[in-house]
């Protein structure tokens, strides 16, 4: 039986963990994993195109499936991670003369994420079911396995190129922002990344980006 590199790494990582635990309990006197580091496996990130995201947004679904879809779309327009959706409260929505902003510290890094909210995103946020009271979280967010199960079905319905899952939301957000010409530094701030280098893994060159830049070059010539 053959495994993909990432799957093999996960199994080896679990084996290393249990070997080290056995050593701490005195069940093993030595461990081949002592001091060993598993090589990182670079994963290719996938994003929805603007057209695919629009198709998903208007797909006729109901109940928990509609909730899963709307949470995905909200994240694709704000860059929020799953855990940040669970901790979102009304206090994270600020309004000034320039419009509405979502500002909140990322749960994973503590870095401040800051995204301007469009009218459409605010409308989507308004129609999502809310929790009462909302001291630790405002939105009703199902567990990620439930969301992924519904996303997979919807992706199959839309004949998407890749299996639709939660991890595609932030990559979709970053890719669409970069295609609009937003700088890598600005996208990094929106995502709440501590370093721009972290954002660069989202900045895969897309066909739309190449055509856009070729068009600019040809006009300049």
Language-model segments: residues:
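N-terminal core-binding DNA-recognition domain of tyrosine site-specific recombinases/integrases
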Residues: 1-20, 63-64, 141-145, 163-165
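Catalytic-site neighborhood detector that most strongly recognizes the C-terminal catalytic loop/helix
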Residues: 47, 106-110, 191-216
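C-terminal catalytic core of Y-nucleophile DNA break-rejoin enzymes
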Residues: 42, 107-127, 132-153
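C-terminal flanking helix
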Residues: 16-19, 23, 206-210
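C-terminal catalytic core of tyrosine-transesterase DNA break-rejoin enzymes
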Residues: 24, 73, 77, 83-84, ...
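Basic, Lys/Arg- and aromatic-enriched nucleic-acid-binding interface segment
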Residues: 5-11, 24-82, 86, 131
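DNA/chromatin major-groove-contacting recognition/catalytic segments
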Residues: 59, 113-116, 123, 127, ...
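Short basic/aromatic active-site micro-motif
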Residues: 67-68, 141-144, 161-180
């Amino acid at each position: 039986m053959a495994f993909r590199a990432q799957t093999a790494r996960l199994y080896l990582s679990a084996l290393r963990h249990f070997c080290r635990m056995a050593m701490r309990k005195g069940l093993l006197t030595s461990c081949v994993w002592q001091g060993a580091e598993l090589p990182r496996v670079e994963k290719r990130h996938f994003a929805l195109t603007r057209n695919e995201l629009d198709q998903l947004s208007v797909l006729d679904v109901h109940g928990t499936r509609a909730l899963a879809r709307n949470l995905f779309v909200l994240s694709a327009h704000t860059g929020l991670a799953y855990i940040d959706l669970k901790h979102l409260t009304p206090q994270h929505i600020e309004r000034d003369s320039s419009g509405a902003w979502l500002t909140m510290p990322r749960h994973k890094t503590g870095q401040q994420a800051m995204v301007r909210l469009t009218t459409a995103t605010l409308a989507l946020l308004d129609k999502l079911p809310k929790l009462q009271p909302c001291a630790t979280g405002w939105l009703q967010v199902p567990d990620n396995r439930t969301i992924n199960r519904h996303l997979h079905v919807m992706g199959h319905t839309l004949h998407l190129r890749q299996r639709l899952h939660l991890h595609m939301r932030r990559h979709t957000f970053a890719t669409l922002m970069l295609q609009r010409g937003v700088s890598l530094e600005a996208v990094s701030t929106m995502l709440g990344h501590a370093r721009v280098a972290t954002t660069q893994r989202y900045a895969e060159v897309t066909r739309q980006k190449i055509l856009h830049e070729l068009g600019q070059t040809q006009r300049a010539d």
